[in-house]
Amino acid sequence: LPNDCASTPDTWLGIVSSMTPPQDHGLDLGPLTGVHVVDLTSNVAAPFGSAILADLGADVLHVEAPKGDDCRRMAPSSGRGSAYFSIVNRNKTGMTLDIRIAEDRRTLDDLIAGADVFVTNLRPGKLEALGLDTSSLNKKYPRLIHASLSAYGQSGPERDKPGYDAVLQARTGIASVTGEANGPPVRAGVSILDVGAGTWLALGVLAALYERQTTGRGSAVSTSLFETGASWVAYHLAAHQVTGKPSQRHGSGHPAFAPYGIYRTQRGEICIGIGGDHLFRELCEAIGRYDLIDDERFRSNGDRARNSGELRTELERTFESKSALEWASQLSDRGLPVDAVNQPEDLLTDRQSRETGILQEIVGPDGRGMRIPGLPITFDGERPRFRMPAPDLSDADRPSPRD
């Protein structure tokens, strides 16, 4: 997989070590050991994608402007940077360059010459102006894989528009189908487009590395928040074309299944996912509501979906007798797909988190240890480990020609 170009690994490490001391991580870092990545990105989406490559063992160098990646200043922040920056730049080494300065631009060119993958999230027009677009790079480095992530894509009239996760959730219709039926459109509670686009970017790089083994040539990999958002609403697009009806908000429910969603209990909420008639019968028997089994409003999944509001009323009348944890335990024991609604921080003490090893220790923005999710993939039962924290901004006070 690694690029067999003129710049040797020793040259690469020599450049990197001028800013960040090399680390002894052992021989087997992961499946991408030996792959060199130059990461000229900022904010969240593209850095998240290159963090996946780093987790898989790639040697990822995060290149920042002298004033630092904007992600360093995202709240909450302290000390080394922000919580966000710690997450999306883990397992990377770091360097600051002002590529408007000739010397720094030559350094960047040297880094790219020694890389297998070059990751960017500048707008397409800016890449072209800098001579960092795929066409320019391919002429110099035919084996290089250029991976780019933008807001609206590499083509089309809006390719150079700026955009963030929430903006593209609105544009692609995700916000319009999120929230309660009688409420306003809502942004999803996690940055699903940032994380999704970053994941697609990493997947594309892996495919391009595999292809290069056969062709000997690099390729251009691109994705965007817009394209990712479009892919997330595939069901809604298909449903509209089948029924002719506009998409709607259903709260925590689902238009095709019932009961499916979040229900109030005596204390807290539970989430139930019933996708078939046999499971509905099991649920009714488990909660002692035999009358609902033969109720004509709820006899089939289609009936229940059409009458989901009435079904919710009936179920919550029963659920108010116990807490969410009690119901979750009772119904899970019957083999039903149900769980209590938790806070994200509950994962820190969750037994399943502990047993799967999904949470790993890393140095946080305040210099203290914190636990965050590692890569949600294991290889032969082993999860790729965190090898180093996000890099310090080691050259933040360097003068800039525009200061």
Q: What role is predicted for each listed range?
A:
Residues 184-193, 264-267, 382-385:
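Flexible glycine/proline-enriched surface loops and loop-helix/loop-strand junctions
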Residues 17-36, 247, 264, 346-403:
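Terminal low-complexity tails and localization/encapsulation signals of metabolic enzymes
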Residues 4, 10-217, 362-363, 391-392, ...:
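N-terminal helix-loop segment corresponding to the beta1-alpha1 unit
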Residues 154, 182-190, 213-229, 245-255, ...:
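Conserved Rossmann-fold dehydrogenase catalytic segment
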Residues 67, 152-153, 225-230, 267, ...:
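Glycine-rich beta-alpha junction loops
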Residues 258-334, 338, 402:
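Aromatic-enriched alpha-helical interface/lid elements that frame and gate functional surfaces
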Residues 332-353:
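Conserved PLP cofactor-binding pocket of PLP-dependent enzymes
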Residues 198-218, 231-243, 284-290:
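Oxidoreductase and adenylate-handling cofactor-binding alpha/beta cores
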